[in-house]
Amino acid sequence: MSHAADDLDRWMRTAFVEMNTELEELYFAQEDRANVDGVGDTIKAALVDEGRALIRPLAAEGNTNEGFDHAFDVLGNLGLFLAALRRHELTNPARESQSPFAEASALGLHIGASLGVAPRFATAHLATHNRAVDGVQKSFTALADEFVFIDYNTMGILSYKRAADALMRVPPLGISNRSTLMLLNNARDALNDVAKTNDILFTRLDKDRFFYSVRPYYKPYRVGRQEYRGANAGDFSGINQIDLLLGLCRANDPSYSQLLIDKMLFMIPEDQTSLRACLIHVPLLDQFLDAAPSASGKEWFRLNCRAFLEVCEAHGFAAVQHHDRLFESFIVKMSDALDSKHHAQLTASGPPLPVLAKALERLRDLRAAAKRDDFETAHGKIETLKRAVGWGA
């Protein structure tokens, strides 16, 4: 890492965190906790000045070809800086045609283009690629609730990746292979771990602190002239690999395929490759349905199909859990009490909250194979397999 990159990283882990934390305490002490205007202006000015002074020499260096990890780390630091400026209303895409922070934008665009990723901070920067130093990883603030959010989101993502890795190993083996049973059980166990970490997250995370002091750092902002949506907890390939390999979601569903396209550049290149790779495989649901007429009485089918259904059930449970206990409780219900003047750009993804809520509800019910009359889910096909193996008997 160059001296300039090292200096920025050190600042991001110290003064940057301290200033954001101080601002959050000022905001949170107000009657209107969502207000940031006219609060802590001296701190905000220092945040801008110190950050820009450290970024200028880095921008002069450009992408120094020191490998993916170095470049992605620098991009993350630039992105965290811009996200903090957006949170404190020092930049806002609604009132600008381009970012007022030219140096950070220029370097971010350079690195993003060279790596094939969006030129802003992404979920991976605070999750799977968030290097801890002396036991402390990067964050916006020193608030305990932010670390609860970062830690248990990261654990959930890693468990999803374990499940996806197990399922990706099934197609070369075939659904009747004895080793497939082990892999399906591995995937189920990993998804059960997702539910366990979700439960800890929802129990320990304070709703007010999350809504007012953590969530606002995940808003859209401009890099150069382009506005980029905020980082989303689902910006990794594992959860979609599971959707597609199980057959609960389909790539030929226009709404779902649009989701895949929209998130592609917000994932690391390795994840982009993994997501593309899983698109060539016939979903396991279809394979078990095709085999059922001739194999439902055979031991391999009974064991492997039941294990497959357990994976589907675990995936659906985690999806319902996340939607109902995090999104509904920590965002939708909290926003109901928010002054309407703060509703603009409430969500990380950009669209109004009711639009986002409808899209996420649809995704939840696809993953849960829920019975819906207004769109097709895997409900009927899953019920057919359950009857074939005597599920619940």
Regions found by a protein language model. Name each.
Residues 1-393:
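Surface-exposed peri-terminal alpha-helical interaction modules
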